[in-house]
A protein has these predicted regions:
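A conserved mid-domain beta-alpha-beta active-site/ligand-binding segment of alpha/beta enzyme cores
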Residues: 181-249
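Active-site cores that bind ATP or allylic diphosphates and position pyrophosphate for catalysis
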Residues: 239, 246-248, 252-263
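Generic surface-pattern signal
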Residues: 23, 27, 105, 215, ...
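A structural signal for short, hydrophobic/glycine-enriched beta-strand patches
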Residues: 1-200, 255-263
């Protein structure tokens, strides 16, 4: 993928405002809360995948991995193929959860009995519903759960889990952790993520994801909130995030650039 061209400082600032907000992080600094389970929702962002495995291993709690084969699974296949260590894992035709379970077991030495696999879900709503069903079947008492997801989908995922368990008297306490907070900056040869890391989105895909995410989070007729599709609980969108998103949508240089570069 060629380097993403230069963007204005104003546009970069708006991108990072939206991206930081979407990557909901309920922690400051190190994770000091002891959980009863870590849920890793299937995605293709290697630092996020590694973060979930690291937490589960350090806390010695079950790692519930959720993800079947969906419209974005090919991005995970690509990420694994390009990774210098994980590329030995077989991907073609396999569910996301099966692939991520191999990473957790083979590379993070998480015992098989501590890896719970949900390999039927194909979207965010099913990730939440099917994961909650597995938790309800667990012999262990699950009170506190750390949910880890692609940072661009982290806030929506949390709102989805809260919607699924809205009417449950003893629902777990959901805590959100995206693994890292994405940030774009102008580099000497174009725009890129800082700090650099393996297994991230292309800049084009990242921008497409974050600009497409806010309409889903709205609580209106077209959104996913209670007044729309009712997939998620109501989400308050801060004014600065809304303004930043509007700026990106009205930035013709950016939209033209994204349209000209196939994802």
């Amino acid at each position: 993928m060629s380097q993403f061209p230069t963007l204005s400082a104003t546009t970069l600032a708006a991108i990072n405002i939206v991206g930081r907000w979407l990557a909901q992080n309920d922690f400051t600094g190190n994770i000091s809360v002891q959980s009863d389970c870590v849920i890793l929702a299937g995605n293709a962002v290697i630092p996020t995948i590694d973060a979930a495995c690291r937490i589960a291993k350090e806390q010695q709690v079950p790692l519930l991995i959720s993800g079947g084969i969906g419209h974005s699974t090919r991005f995970l296949y690509d990420a694994i193929a390009q990774h210098p260590r994980y590329n030995i894992i077989r991907t073609t035709g396999r569910a996301e959860a099966a692939i991520l379970a191999d990473i957790a077991h083979q590379f993070w030495q998480i015992p098989g009995e501590k890896i719970w696999v949900e390999d039927q879900s194909t979207n965010c709503g099913e990730n939440a519903r099917f994961s909650c069903a597995l938790l309800n079947q667990a012999a262990e008492s699950i009170h506190t759960v750390i949910v880890v997801q692609d940072p661009t989908m982290q806030r929506r995922t949390m709102a989805t889990f809260q919607r699924v368990t809205r009417d449950e008297q003893h629902a777990p306490h959901w805590l959100s952790f995206p693994g890292f907070i994405p940030e774009l900056a102008q580099q000497h040869n174009g725009v890129d993520f800082v700090p650099a890391a393996e297994g991230l989105w292309s800049v084009e895909r990242y921008l497409s994801l974050i600009t497409g995410e806010l309409p889903r989070l709205r609580d209106d007729a077209a959104g996913y909130g209670p007044c729309g599709h009712d997939f998620i609980v109501h989400v308050d969108i801060p004014q600065d995030v809304e303004q930043a998103w509007q700026q990106l949508k009205n930035d013709t240089a950016l939209t033209d650039l994204l349209e000209s570069r196939s994802l």
